[in-house]
Regions:
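Second-shell loop/turn segments in exported
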Residues: 78-86, 126
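Amphipathic alpha-helical segments
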Residues: 85-106
């Protein structure tokens, strides 16, 4: 039962959902650190959480096998993930996986003592940007579906 939420936590989440739904005119589902917003047109965006998302735009990129996910923003059009505790060798391995997954068109790379940046696109017109901060061992990943 240690994984169950307390009644007060459930009540607080439900109250927060109602306030946000009324203010924004959207459906809101709060589940601990994760919030899902569904617009009137059915579009969905998920924010928060500390797990790698496996749906919407996140399904278009390889899953990072190391580090600790600290932030997620995921929708059908874009995805941002921040991963901490990523060693440089793990970033380099992930970069190889991303390129092998097809993110190699329109490629631009930059690296200095502070950052390594990789920008590319795949054949589905999905653009990806990786920014690895060497000192903090943090990887910021962003993908967006380009409009046609």
């Amino acid at each position: 039962l240690t994984g169950c939420k307390s009644p007060s936590k459930i009540a607080a989440e439900k109250a927060g959902e109602k306030i946000l739904e009324k203010a924004a005119g959207v459906k809101v589902d709060i589940d601990g650190e994760k919030m899902t917003v569904v617009g009137e047109d059915g579009t969905q965006m998920t924010m928060g959480g500390n797990e790698w998302p496996e749906d919407q735009m996140a399904k278009e990129i390889p899953k990072m096998g190391s580090g600790t996910v600290s932030y997620v923003l995921n929708s059908a059009e874009f995805c941002t993930i921040i991963i901490n505790e990523v060693k440089e060798k793990d970033f380099e391995k992930y970069l190889t996986e991303v390129e092998s997954a097809g993110f190699s068109a329109e490629k631009a790379e930059y690296s200095d003592d502070a950052n390594s940046i990789y920008i590319a696109q795949n054949d589905k017109r999905i653009s990806l940007q990786l920014n690895y901060e060497h000192k903090s061992e943090a990887l910021s990943l962003a993908i967006v579906k380009e409009s046609e």
